[in-house]
Swiss-Prot record:
Gene Ontology CC: endoplasmic reticulum membrane; Golgi apparatus
Organism whose genome encodes this protein: Canis lupus familiaris
Quaternary structure and partners: Homodimer.
Modification(s) after translation: Methylation at some His residue by METTL9 leads to reduced zinc-binding.
Protein name (database record): Zinc transporter SLC39A7
Topology in membrane: Multi-pass membrane protein
Length: 469
């Protein structure tokens, strides 16, 4: 009994250690510093410097006749050229308007055109990367976030879905459900809503209007679409793989189906009695030598075997659904890494660390779901590696896509439009339909308490990671 309780306690200690690591990193990084660093990486200036530029007070004469609109396109001029626009709130020699602070197509003595990205305002630090180095960094970071959680799986003392590992597997499943729900509600959906609520080109005094409800409504519809799509896929897979599996849900239905070949419909009033009589007649007719012992064997065994077949089929479908959701989620992680490295090496490293902290508990939960669905430990680990294809594809898409805003999770507006909320809907479906029902089985009070703590641990882990982002 001591050995049986050791593994769940070991998992609890591991979860608490990981939570402490998240708190340590969160306290060290700080939300304000992260926001300032990201702002400097995205726009090339800090709030302090822009404030000084507004009150610099210099005034130069400009002779090229550029209009106010031309300033927004990032034209640069030397110090001997200048202009006096009364409607500008600064007199700096670059001649950039207030709106141009969101773009970085200017310089002191030479021109730059980076399409929204570029070098950091810090002197002596070159942030833009050549093409080969950019691809090497981005793909290397993607391989890292895919391989690091894979090695963590070796430490989990679960080999298969057997009674010997059942208690530990249930705790891991509860942790997986908490991680999936926390990921959907605290990470994916907020990131999908964030570009619509805090657009960088939005006017400071612009109020909310009814037109802004459209994107928010579309995010909600995509979440529901993900739930419905996963429901349709599960029904389709059950229909193709299960076929007659639904008629085996109860032992009495099974017996009636076999006995109905030689009898009419007069058996329906007394279903239980007649099905047992049919089994007895069939046993006496086809297996006369075994007599009643066969009926006693087949009676309790048939419902058990059919129920196990049904349960195994259900869990296999849930495993496939979880792999599909994990593949889409890894695609968004790849988009985040590729887009962040396009914004600069420092931003790319920061995003990689954040995604890595997020992926380790997530992969542990996915591993538990795969093992519960009938996979061995090696099979589950191989399937987890296959989902890395989604991350590599997302990174390649982010690097090949020109333009677009750099977000913490998507490149441009493509991913935030439907990938994130659709994936969130898939996570919600897998957690509530496939994983949580497994936690409703009868268990001891201690086991039930550990399962609830595991679920809360998964949610708390996502809260800590959300603060880091």
């Amino acid at each position: 009994m001591a050995r049986g309780l050791g593994a769940p306690h070991w998992v609890a200690v591991g979860l608490l250690t990981w939570a402490a690591l998240g708190l340590l990193v969160a306290g060290h990084g700080g939300h304000g510093d992260l926001h300032e660093d990201l702002h400097e990486d995205f726009h090339g200036h800090s709030h302090r410097r822009s404030h000084e530029d507004f009150h610099h007070g210099h005034s130069y004469a400009h002779g090229h006749g550029h209009t106010h609109e031309s300033i927004w396109h990032g034209h640069t001029h030397g110090h001997e050229h200048g202009h006096a626009h009364e409607d500008l709130h600064h007199g700096h020699s670059h001649g950039q308007s207030h709106e141009s602070l969101y773009h970085r197509g200017h310089g002191h003595d030479h021109e730059h055109s980076h399409g929204g990205y570029g070098e950091s305002g810090a002197p002596g630090i070159k942030q833009d990367l050549d093409t080969v180095t950019l691809w090497a960094y981005a793909l290397g970071a993607t391989v890292l976030i895919s391989a690091a959680p894979f090695f963590v799986l070796f430490l989990i003392p679960v080999e298969s879905n057997s009674p010997r590992h059942r208690s530990l597997l249930q705790i891991l499943l509860s942790f997986a459900s908490g991680g999936l729900l926390g990921d959907a509600f605290l990470h994916l959906i907020p990131h999908a809503l964030e570009p619509h609520s805090h657009h960088p080109l939005e006017q400071p005094g612009h109020g909310h209007s009814h037109s802004g409800q459209g994107p928010i409504l579309s995010v909600g519809l995509w979440v529901l679409s993900g739930i419905v799509a996963f429901l349709v896929v599960e029904k389709f897979v059950r229909h193709v793989k299960g076929g007659h599996g639904h008629s085996h849900g109860h032992g009495h239905t099974h017996g009636h189906t076999q006995g109905s070949h030689g009898h009419g419909t007069q058996k329906y009033p007394s279903k239980e009695k007649q099905s047992s009589e049919e089994e007895e007649k069939e046993a006496n007719g086809s297996r006369k030598r075994k007599g009643g012992s066969t009926r006693l064997k087949d009676g309790p065994l048939r419902p058990q075997n059919s129920e196990e077949e049904k349960t195994g089929s259900d869990l296999r479908v849930s495993g496939y659904l979880n792999l599909a959701a994990d593949l889409a989620h890894n695609f968004t992680d790849g988009l985040a890494i590729g887009a962040s490295f396009r914004g600069g090496r420092g931003l790319g490293i920061l995003t990689t660390m954040t995604v890595l902290l997020h992926e380790v508990p997530h992969e542990v939960g996915d591993f538990a779901i795969l093992v519960q669905s009938g996979c061995s430990k090696k099979q589950a680990m191989r399937l987890q590696l296959l989902t890395a294809i989604g991350a590599l594809a997302g990174t390649a898409c982010a690097l090949l896509t020109e333009g677009g805003a750099v977000g913490s999770e998507v490149a441009g507006g493509t991913g935030s439009g439907w990938v994130l909320p659709f994936t969130a809907g898939g996570f919600i479906y897998v957690a509530t339909v496939s994983v949580l029902p497994e936690l409703l089985r009868e268990a001891s009070p201690l086991q039930s308490l550990l399962e609830v703590l595991g679920l809360l641990g998964g949610v708390v882990m996502m809260v800590l990671i959300a603060h880091l982002e």
